[in-house]
Amino acid sequence: MAELDGIESKLFTARDFRLESGQSLPVLELAYETYGSLSPARDNAILVVHGYTSSHHAAGRNASGKQGRGVAAGAPGWFDGLIGPGKAVDTNHSFVVSVNALGSAHGSTGPNCTDPRTGKPYGPTFPDITMRDIVAAEKLLVDSLGLKSLTAVIGPSMGGFQSFQWAASYPGFMKAIVPSVTAPRSPAGLDRLEALQARLAGDPNWNGGWYYENGGIAKTLEELRFETLMAYGQNEILAETMPDPKAREAAIRANAKAWAQIYDGHSMVTLRKAIGSFDITGDYAKLKNTKVLYVQSPSDKLFDIALSPAYVSDMRKAGIDVTYVELPSNKGHMASHADAALWAPILGAFLKRLQ
């Protein structure tokens, strides 16, 4: 099967982006990648949105020097098992746009970006944002590409939140959404915001949040990342090819250390706040004309699968066409991409029915 090579990270720019809070960002930048070609009728576009600390590098491999901020040279995209020529999201037929969320640290406007009004990083002054703000920014990108509709919005975890929010904010704009390892509302305590803020503030270089010129807080970020990867199921993923537990731990710690050099603590807080306030369960009526392929995994420790039947039942009662799939995966919160083969045929068939 052919692969995607030579992918370039691109940048969309807009001015004076107004947030729900009433505050405005003088400059809005969104990093993104595209795969495949837009049809003459401009009717074959799919939007892919990422999880909490992921990037917009969802598929293929970047051209030399053309990767987004913090993306390792030559690294495959995190949804590479699903996106590409002949794959479930078939780039021979679909034009795929993958975007880095507002507030993230992989090239889009976020706390580590320069505030044009001060010439310094926003840092702790970056305004609070909501999932609605994140999606509204993405809509500007989609509009700039001349897309009048989307076939689907696809995303895991926080990307699933975004897909649900897309359907609620812009009903009828997309034919379907494909949220995975996620829920239509943020479960109580998922954000663990106060604990995160306390951990970050405990770093000796915190300096009231102005750590950029104070040595940074990479050590604390490294510890947080290691804990997150373990909770997400990275140990189980590596176990298939790395039987030695010590070797797995060393590999995960190396991953965490590399990530900590490029990510930003304030981005973690900003996105956690958006995650904590997310809830579209009161907007189900807006999703009546949007098909939903909802994918969960029993091994996911972040989103309790016991809650899924009630979500599905409530959506169906609201008249939403929901297809519900449980993945027999032991990969935890990473199931939808680490075990992509388990549901690739289901996703491929679902998308073909939308064409």
Regions found by a protein language model. Give the residues of each.
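Conserved acidic catalytic loop of the alpha/beta-hydrolase fold
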Residues: 119-125, 132-152
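Alpha/beta-hydrolase-fold enzymes
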Residues: 173-258
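Conserved alpha/beta-hydrolase "acid-adjacent" motif
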Residues: 301-310
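Catalytic active-site module of serine/aspartate enzymes centered on a nucleophile-bearing elbow/loop
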Residues: 312, 316-355
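N-terminal cap/lid subdomain of alpha/beta-hydrolase-fold enzymes
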Residues: 33-115
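Active-site nucleophile elbow and catalytic-triad environment of alpha/beta-hydrolase enzymes
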Residues: 267-284
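Conserved hydrolase catalytic core segment
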Residues: 149-191
